[in-house]
Amino acid sequence: MTTELFTTANTVTAHEHIGFELGWDYAHYRLVPPAPYAQEPSPLRNGLLAGQAAFGSRTLAATRPVRKWLQLRLHAWLRGRSVELMQVTPNYLSQLEVSHCPITRTALSTATLDSSDASVDRVRNDAGYAAGNLAVISTKANHAKAGYGFHDALRFVKQIEAGKLGGIDGLSACQWSRVAVLCSYVEPMSHEEASTIPMLVLPPNRLRMFNPVQALQAFISQQLMAPGWSHRAARFEAMLPGKPARRAFLTFFHALLPRVLEASRANGKQHTRWAIEDAWRNPLVLKRWTAFARLLTATQCEELVARANAKKLGALRAQQLPDEAATEGWNLDSRGYVPHAVLMKRSPTSARTGLGEQIPQPVGTQASLPL
């Protein structure tokens, strides 16, 4: 085996390649990165100039989702965070949009530089920007959540309640409890532990749920979001294994139902969502849910969701993924950062563009990012 050594100055790293592709995409939509990134020498600027030379005026329409997509990628690139581009597309990001922050419940704004501005959060902080790990929350909630997870948020709730504090990092105990529940969805835990968590925030669209009992919990809770829930609940009850499980389900559902109906009457879909979440704060609702959930196994929870979804009993569609596919592109091994890798070696005589920028010549196969 022969080993060849070369300096980093003659190589292109994964981070440089991503920056070049990002600049290329800015040019493809006839946009320019914010100052100073468009002027300072960098792989981003190289890609921008190369793209402008290649596309000229033959560019694509820069829609609002496209602008948010490029902004997210720029923000991630500057911090070395990975973005999985096969699934995280402008269309995907548009499916995550909500009118109100699920943590603070304030109406979200756009580009006002206020704490109410919408921002895309990596729910699991040791993963990158990838499908199933993203949710739109307010800038205020995003900054407070920072790198904290499920157990951190629970600790903050206890500290606030024990010390009678107004809040921590601008969030109240109720808001931190929603952060905890949101984080719990993407943190694998035992069936016993997951069955004791109240659904204080319903899972955002396209979020992947790692605990089967919580997927079942969300499936049942969201029945009340759409008309016809009584018929669907009866059909779901008939699917349960055995009389004890059916009896426990009815006991739980009858505890949840009146609290939701009373709070959400004639107030619209958003208030119905909040009413469902608030109903889970009642100790009786959680107690009866836990009793029901522990009559099932994690496997049975998965099967129930799959069967109910096949029968179209859900208010929303659910898609189940194999374990290995659920975290594809999350870069858990590098804790959500771009893995350090050399993608190609520059040729001593690099080709030049008309703008005086050197284009590296690939060695072997160049890893490429989809546009």
Each predicted region: which residue ranges?
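DEDD superfamily 3′-5′ metal-dependent exonuclease/proofreading module
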Residues: 2, 13, 36, 41, ...
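N-terminal alpha-helical interaction blocks
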Residues: 2-70
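Catalytic cores of phosphodiester-bond-cleaving enzymes
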Residues: 24, 28, 47-48, 52-54, ...
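Short, charged surface segments at domain edges that flank catalytic/cofactor-binding sites
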Residues: 54-100
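Generic detector of well-ordered alpha-helical segments enriched in charged/polar residues
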Residues: 71, 75, 90-94, 154-158, ...
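Histidine-centered nuclease catalytic patch
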Residues: 79-93, 99-149
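Polybasic, low-complexity binding patches
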Residues: 123-135, 143-190
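C-terminal, charged low-complexity interaction regions
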Residues: 193-371
